Amino acid sequence: ATVRNTCYDYAAFAEKNSQFVMSSAVYATASGQEISAVTIPEECFQDQESGANLNPVVLYVERVVAKVRVKLDSDALETKTITENNQNYTMVALLKDNEKGNTPDNYLTVDGKQVYAKFLGWNVTAATERSSLSKFINPQWNIFTGWNYAPYFRSYWALNCEEAGTRYMPLIGSEGGYSVVGGRNLGTSYTSMYANENAAANSNFTNGLGRAYPSTVIMAAQLCDAAGKPINAYHWLGQMSVGEESLKTAMLEQLGRIDSKLYAKSVEGTQTVIKEIAEADLKMYTAVEADKATLTPEVTGRYYTYVMLSEAGEAKEWYSTPECTPESKMDKKAVNSFLNSTLGAAEIWNNGYTYYYFPIRHLGDKQNNGNEGYYGVVRNHIYQVNVNKVVGMGTPVYNPGETIIPEKPDNSDTFVSAKINILSWRLVHNNVELDWSVK
């Protein structure tokens, strides 16, 4: 029992050693009995090798890990390849409307330039950090049809170990750490990686429902023009444009239109100088940095960016009137609160960084339901993903080093279409459309 309960990062072991661990197949009999080991018949014990060879023990084993494979569908997407620093990248022309195809009037543009997604890599996020050596099931499960098939000595669902954990990652990480870009290249040929089992949580033992946060394929990209140059796009107050400096200028213009102002008092030589807030006083912060969101799946809006005082701005004295009276003095917190309430949040694709994602479907394309087993990763399966449509600009990333818990913007016009297959290894196909179109 101790060996069977061993909980370990078998996916990392497989990635590091190019080998995977196997264990006895686990399944349920027709009478509802769990089979997790093989009984060795008496006749298999022989005192001669020749006799043992005539009476072998029949074992059924399965890989402890799953495999995920992803590619871009060159037949369905408009793609081009560019080379940067001896590295090939696949660029995909982005669409505006999911209902339309690859037609000139449906290509997405910003400031008159057609926008491409230059894919930098992919990884599996929200994945479990560990899985058990031997699969655990509830033989009494009455869940999706075909979850168990005794004649093939197989079952197609599982319980996570108690120490499974959950791993999230940034777009670009430090050396040796997990990151989206540090996963696998994403192009028009399949690349693959191993993944730990991530099916049912122990708290859902009786009904076998999947985890609230299933393993998810996440794809890193840069928004680029046709030559591969990143587009620093932003979306603010319903307007889409390019350049962080342009955004700050627009925000200052907005402040100039309202009655309430911000004034800084400083001494230059022997003169007391009073100036309205300027671009050098402002800096953009992620929602997490601005304490507007936390890195927890239950919280949304992590993709937003907020303008607040820069270091230079924090060093100044701020007032709400040009007279700079003691009564009108504002501390840093009050100034930032005023900026947030007056200007709101922006979406900034800093250096063009963006991401697309989708949960891995365990039942694949042929089972169209959102119930038990629809999402999940089970050992000894291959989840084969074919991305055949990319609509919209993805979820904006301002700080590529900040941990990402995937989410789609509320006004998103982005969509990803993909197809997943699982391989004996059991193969599950996922055809996926990445749809981030504005609703």
Model-derived features: positions:
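Serine/threonine-rich, low-complexity linker/repeat segments that form flexible spacers/stalks
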Residues: N55-V57, A76
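Short, solvent-exposed beta-strand/turn "edge" segments of beta-rich domains on protein surfaces
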Residues: V57-R63, G208-G210
